[in-house]
Regions:
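Post-signal-peptide N-terminal segment of Sec-exported extracytoplasmic proteins
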Residues: 36-82
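Sec-dependent bacterial lipoprotein signal peptides
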Residues: 1-22
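Short, ordered, surface-exposed loop/turn motifs in non-cytosolic proteins
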Residues: 46-65, 152-172
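Short, acidic Ser/Thr/Gly-rich low-complexity loop/linker segments typical of extracellular
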Residues: 64-88, 170-185
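Beta-strand-rich domain onsets/edges
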Residues: 21-36, 40-45, 130-141
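A short, solvent-exposed loop/turn motif at the edges and junctions
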Residues: 90-127, 206-215
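Short Pro-Gly-centered beta-turn/loop motif in secreted/extracellular proteins
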Residues: 79-99, 180-203
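Extracellular beta-sheet/turn segments enriched in Thr/Pro/Gly and aliphatic residues
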Residues: 27, 115-145, 213-234
Length: 234
């Protein structure tokens, strides 16, 4: 049986692999093989069809911790969430260390969460049936603005802000090393894309020079078509 891999990608604040190069793959002129990709994209939160989400077929290779990507084709999911397209690929790419990736991306209305939901599937050999009846999972997008208000006079060592939306996987959004750095950065607002219609948890940790710390945990329910605002006073 030819190997095809479904990928549940874990996103962390500092990614192990970084996309170094992304470009359009050249049109195949020799050693071509035809491959069809079809399936559907759903909103994982509601198990309903997701319209207008980009699905891409790409060559990917990791070199020294960086990825090289050549996009072969991209289509958007239809009103019923489906996608179906056929591409000619240069099969010699497999012998050059590339694998073939079918992945879903974010759109104006949806975001991808690599730590929750299938967003990519791969094949490392030419297999015309590798990308049949695939289902990708995305989440409805909501916009959240964190407003930072430095009003206290305490002298902290570091101040970290993180958020979580589905589960307890926290993404770090901001970390400063001193009160003065807040002023130096001149950062008063942080814009976040989060999941709509669920409670986004906001966690702050203030650490002092003596090793003690204080933690706050709160949440806000964000909706689509508007920007929710959460004020952080520290």
């Amino acid at each position: 049986m030819k190997p095809t891999y479904k990928i549940l990608v874990t996103l962390i604040s500092v990614s192990i692999f970084t996309t170094a190069c992304k470009k359009q793959a050249p049109v195949c002129t020799s050693n071509c093989g035809t491959i069809n990709a079809n399936g559907n994209v759903i909103n994982k939160q509601t198990n309903t069809n997701a319209l207008g989400v980009p699905v891409s077929l790409s060559w990917v290779k990791f070199v020294g911790g960086f990825s090289q990507k050549e996009v072969i084709a991209t289509v958007n999911s239809k009103i019923d969430g489906s996608f179906n397209f056929t591409s000619n690929i240069d099969t010699t790419y497999f012998s050059k260390g590339y694998f073939l990736s079918l992945s879903v991306g974010k759109s104006n209305d949806y975001i991808v969460l690599g730590y929750s939901g299938l967003i990519e599937t791969r094949t490392y050999v030419f297999d015309q049936n590798a990308f049949q009846a695939k289902q990708f999972e995305v989440y409805k997008k909501a916009n959240l603005k964190l407003k930072l208000n430095r009003t206290l006079k305490d002298n902290f060592k570091s101040y970290a802000i993180a958020h979580a939306n589905v589960g307890d996987f926290y993404l770090h959004n901001y970390n400063v090393q001193s009160p003065q750095e807040v002023l130096d950065r001149n950062t008063s607002e942080i814009n976040i894309e989060t999941v709509a219609d669920v409670y986004t948890k906001i966690k702050t940790v203030k650490t002092f020079a003596n090793g003690t710390s204080t933690t706050t945990l709160d949440s806000i329910r964000c909706t689509t078509n508007s920007t929710s605002i959460y004020n952080i006073i520290f």
